[in-house]
Curated annotation (Swiss-Prot):
InterPro entries found in the cross-reference section: BORCS7
Primary gene name: borcs7
Name of protein: BLOC-1-related complex subunit 7
Domain of life: Eukaryota
Organism: Xenopus tropicalis (Western clawed frog)
Main location: membrane
Length: 104
């Protein structure tokens, strides 16, 4: 072989080595990119699930607030009824005393 042929062979081997290195680097970059895309997709799914959970919790909170308002109204009505019953008991005691006094 001549010197130029040997130089061309070495140059060809060098180019092949560089190409092999570049191909493996590109492959690693593609794998890293794929992992990042999958991670981003998973993050999006998690955000969507979190949003759905928040909506469900908001509905529960609104329902709880409504229930508390209703319970406050019921409590007020029960207090009025208790006061009316107390007045009736007092009047009943007075009537019993008056009846006892009349029957004597």
């Amino acid at each position: 072989m001549t010197a130029s042929t040997e130089g061309q062979a070495r140059y060809g081997q060098s180019v092949k080595g560089l190409l092999t290195e570049k191909v493996s680097t590109c492959g690693a970059d593609v794998i890293a990119l794929t992992k990042q895309v999958l991670k981003g997709s998973h993050s999006s799914e998690l955000l969507g699930q979190a949003a759905r959970n928040m909506v469900m919790q908001e509905d529960s909170i609104l329902h709880s607030e409504d229930s508390l308002r209703k319970m406050a109204i019921i409590t007020t009505h029960l207090q009025y009824q208790q006061e009316a019953i107390q007045k009736n008991v007092e009047q009943s005691s007075n009537l019993q005393d008056q009846l006892k006094h009349l029957l004597k």
